Amino acid sequence: RIAMIFQDPYNSFHPTYSIIEQIKDIVGEISSKELNGYLSKLSLQKDLLYKKPHELSGGQLQRCSILRALLMKPDLLLVDEPTSALDNIIAYDVMKLLIKLLDNCGILLITHDLDMAKWCSDKIIRLEENARK
């Protein structure tokens, strides 16, 4: 299973369906215990899941994207600037959480934040002016 967290969370959710409908459409049934645990760790309130994407802030919606990815239990997680809508402290907390909860999952991180990449990566491939370094 492959999950992806996009840079712009508004483009990763359909605008006319609630967040929970879209998560269940991909993940299927979700245990309340598991859902509540992730909600707590991501500092999300359950009532936000029943709203449509445009009713949430960018940071809230990005954390919903992360929630969806966690609930998928992927073997590989592709993340494109996953913390772009989050402040620095929350961004590092979210990456710590992803690494901890997805212990047996490969994570491919695309980021402009070299400090973040150095902090959380085993291997870094840097692209600069179309050259691989």
Enumerate the predicted regions with their spans:
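Q-loop/switch helix immediately C-terminal to the Walker
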Residues: D8, P15-I30
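Conserved ABC ATPase "signature" region
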Residues: S32-D47
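Conserved ABC ATPase signature
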Residues: K52-L56, Q60
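Hydrophobic anchor residue at the start of the ABC signature
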Residues: I66, V94
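Conserved catalytic motifs of ABC-family nucleotide-binding domains
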Residues: K73
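Catalytic Walker B motif of ABC-type/P-loop ATPase nucleotide-binding domains
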Residues: L77-E81
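Conserved H-loop
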Residues: C105-I110
